[in-house]
Amino acid sequence: GDKLKELISQKAILEVIAIGIKLNLDTETGIKFSQYQSTAECLREYDFAQLKDSCILIKGARSFAFERLFNHMSLQFHQTVLETNFNSISRNLNTYRKLIKPSTKIMAVVKAEAYGSGSVKMAQFLDDQKIDYLAVALIDEAIKIRAANSQLPIMVFNIQDNNLKALWDYNLEPEIYSLTVLKRVLSYAENLQKKIAVHIKVDSGMHRLGFMPDEVPELIRILGNTDFIQVASIFSHLSASEDEVHDDYTISQINYFNAAYKQISESLGVNPIKHILNTAGVIRFNEHQYDMVRLGLGLYGIDETNSKKIQLEKAHTLKARVLQIKKIERDQTTGYSRAGRV
């Protein structure tokens, strides 16, 4: 009892619900305290609806069936719930780590709320897992992660003119994929008189974003004439690394990227991080892991290569309630435009 009270006071806990044990907390501590003889009593009498924006630790012996508390809280407001198993993510991460050298860095892509897992919680988890870099799509996502005290380097894929200052305010590293974006960032850096680390994207054949071959000389000229831009990495993205039908094209992308990296780095006299492999590339083109690899959907157990080399665990479980079950006769139709037919 005393040991438990000491832990509670040390961890700045705001509320304690005790079930099946007698616990006397000093009312002067300001901790909200309630006590129940059984899980069933707690379910009947506690007002779970008042729990909002809270981090809840459920701990106890299996005999108390605390999973009933979890299920009840999960279903209070949302009848559809996406559960994320962080143990599975950890095991998937370790599976990929076995495929790369100890010296190879890992950039975890946590865009779109970490594919539904929650970008802040995922970032905190990956920080504990000793990930080297995070990548997000938007500055807003990066700011949320920074606000949760993550100190990991964060690359931002897409930046806008109206939020450039946030790059310096939150120590973020933008992807630079065109001369226009480069000039905007450089102009802002010069106005602030503050250096910024950036990631140069080369278009090796995906033809979405990135510097084309004829733009590289101007890129080198601009970077060579400023002290305000630090090239943290040079990278590219493979179009179809998961599909062996396109292996020749993938190899041509890698070969072009190697040449572009050499041209840029040697011209500038720098040695930035070099990376081109995405999740599928780690499995199928392992010899090109270079300085860093980028992991996305693979962390959640999705392997687009369908490789037999690795065994991943699905980290997401989507749970929903069935609203209604009907019995209808053969040849009857269902839904809009009568699209379903029995």
PLM feature spans:
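Active-site anion/phosphate-binding pocket segments in diverse small-molecule metabolic enzymes
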Residues: E83-N85, S90-K98, K105-A108, E141, ...
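Residue-level signal for inorganic ion chemistry
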Residues: V16, G20, I58, I145, ...
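Hydrophobic residues within beta-strands of alpha/beta enzymes
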Residues: V16, I56, L134-A135, I154, ...
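ATP-dependent carboxylate-amine ligase
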Residues: G1-R91, K98, A137-I139
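Active-site regions of enzymes building and remodeling cell-envelope glycoconjugates
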Residues: T29-E41, L152, N171-P174, Y290-V293
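Active-site-proximal beta-alpha core segment in soluble small-molecule metabolic enzymes
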Residues: E83, N87-R91, T104-I273
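Active-site loop-to-helix "anion-binding N-cap" substructures in soluble metabolic enzymes
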Residues: A18, L23, Y36, R62, ...
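Glycine/Thr-rich phosphate-binding loops of Rossmann-like dinucleotide-binding domains
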Residues: D26-T27, A65-E67, K144, L164, ...
